[in-house]
């Protein structure tokens, strides 16, 4: 399989999907359902480029839900939460009130790995060396779930990325190891994809048609 040609073709196809918005809405739902009930409080993601699925709206809803649940649990007066209180929470910084954090990658130029910095809507951003927006001077977080973009994906939970190796090098150094979840549209399925020795299988892959891959649970 020519990965360079496959990568180029899939990116071009993704950019020109006539129903990309509908696919994105479906994948948002799949992602939120997959996250339901997970106890994790720090999730790493990415800033979408080249027509990638945008995971940030679903993650912000996840963070917002956790904030409201925390507020409700602290309301020990047994009185209903007033509408104006909910409105106040909505207008305050969810990121500051929430027990949950969202991290976006920042490239470590020395080690060629990724460090995750806290992100929230409206946080200060700057472009990295590749022109991709990244959080500016926010706290470093260590994700226990890591959503990664897939150009393509194949059997066994392996992904086709951009060929830079940043995620594979990062996963080799993160401790504890996070649960890794690929995100991509179903047109990226590559049935004949063959992983290389340095490729690391993901724990799950989600697409607009549902859970495309889920690693068996270990005893």
Feature annotation, model-predicted:
Residues 1-5, 12, 137, 141-146, ...:
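Surface-exposed, charge/polar-rich loops and edge strands
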Residues 1-141:
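N-terminal active-site beta-alpha-beta segment that forms phosphate/nucleotide-binding
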Residues 43, 146-147:
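Receiver (REC) domain switch-region micro-motif
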Residues 47, 106, 118, 134, ...:
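Short, structured patches in soluble enzyme cores that scaffold and shape functional sites
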Residues 48-51, 151-155:
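Short glycine-rich anion-binding loops that position phosphate/pyrophosphate groups of nucleotides
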